[in-house]
């Protein structure tokens, strides 16, 4: 709403995501700057940290895999641990959304001078009933919806979402799951 961004180049990898992430984590390749020549800084907004020889900024949203590894797959834990090691060794700046996450980063061995708190921020505005109705009509959203998004991993509790849907379906047999 009222936000405009300059035209940004977008480059897709030929590698499937899982292979690309593993390649970054274990080989440091492909380099981000090879995909977008002229790039001056690389910002990884997740634990998917590309290989680069440029200044590297990484946003660390949480270190839940250290506190509750049981909520992650074995593969996920290995991936996050390896990513953390790469961030420790190679990130010039680490952004944390809260003081608690910043402290977790330091406790995990990231130098405190590289960790900066930058809170998540979003400006919201009230939406009128008329705007909601217009949007629902424009997108043919006549019914009630429950939306789940996320990766399929234990900490996302998809089985809990499906269990809740079963209960909902018993009370409202017309309820359905759509992909």
Regions found by a protein language model. Give the residues of each.
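Carbohydrate transferase catalytic cores enriched for Leloir-type hexosyltransferases
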Residues: 1-179
């Amino acid at each position: 709403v009222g936000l405009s961004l300059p035209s940004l180049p977008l480059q897709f990898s030929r590698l499937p995501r899982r292979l690309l992430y593993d390649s970054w984590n274990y080989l440091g390749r492909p380099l981000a700057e090879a995909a977008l020549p002229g790039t001056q800084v690389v910002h990884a907004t997740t634990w998917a940290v590309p290989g680069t020889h440029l200044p590297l900024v990484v946003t660390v949203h949480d270190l839940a895999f250290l506190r509750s590894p049981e909520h992650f797959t074995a593969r996920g834990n290995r991936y996050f641990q390896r990513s953390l090691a790469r961030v420790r060794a190679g990130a010039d700046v680490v952004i944390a959304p809260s003081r608690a996450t910043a402290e977790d980063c330091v406790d995990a061995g990231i130098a405190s001078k590289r960790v900066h708190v930058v809170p998540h921020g979003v400006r919201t505005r009230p939406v009128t009933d008329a705007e909601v109705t217009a949007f629902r009509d424009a997108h043919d959203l006549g019914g009630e919806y429950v939306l789940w998004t996320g990766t399929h991993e234990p900490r996302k509790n998809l089985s809990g979402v499906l269990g809740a849907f079963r209960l909902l379906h018993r009370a409202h047999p017309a309820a359905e799951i759509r992909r």
